[in-house]
Amino acid sequence: MNLSFCVQALLLLWLSLTAVCGVPLMLPPDGKGLEEGNMRYLVKPRTSRTGPGAWQGGRRKFRRQRPRLSHKGPMPF
């Protein structure tokens, strides 16, 4: 009877720990810690809003710099 009581107490302790933590106290299958294992799901790479487009990033390189317009003087073009 004492053995079954100890087993029930250990089972209750284990279930309460897993309910509080949300997961069993083990490492994820990739072998990293709990925080490093979940990091790939939390962080997403930055992407542009419009997508790559036809220029594929070369637009800045070939764009002609426009002169600044001032309030005084003639128009530059």
UniProtKB/Swiss-Prot annotation:
Induction: During pregnancy and lactation. The record marks M75, F77 as: Important for the balance between G(i) and beta-arrestin pathways induced by apelin-13-APLNR system. GO terms for cellular component: extracellular region; extracellular space; perinuclear region of cytoplasm. One of its GO terms (biological process) is feeding behavior. InterPro entries: Apelin. Residues 58-71 have a biased composition (Basic residues). Expressed in the lung, testis, ovary, uterus and mammary gland. Expressed in neurons in the thalamic paraventricular and hypothalamic supraoptic nuclei. The lung, testis and uterus mainly contain a large form that looks like apelin-36, whereas the mammary gland seems to contain 2 forms of apelin, a large form close to apelin-36 and a small form close to apelin-13 (at protein level). The keyword 4Fe-4S does not apply. Keywords: Angiogenesis, Cleavage on pair of basic residues, Developmental protein, Gastrulation, Hormone, Secreted, Signal. GO terms for molecular function: apelin receptor binding; hormone activity; identical protein binding. Residues 1-22 form the signal peptide. Residues 45-77 are annotated as: Disordered. It comes from the Eukaryota. Residues 23-41 form a propeptide. Belongs to the apelin family. Peptide hormone that functions as endogenous ligand for the G-protein-coupled apelin receptor (APLNR/APJ), that plays a role in cadiovascular homeostasis. Functions as a balanced agonist activating both G(i) protein pathway and beta-arrestin pathway of APLNR. Downstream G proteins activation, apelin can inhibit cAMP production and activate key intracellular effectors such as ERKs. On the other hand, APLNR activation induces beta-arrestin recruitment to the membrane leading to desensitization and internalization of the receptor. This is Apelin. It comes from Rattus norvegicus (Rat).
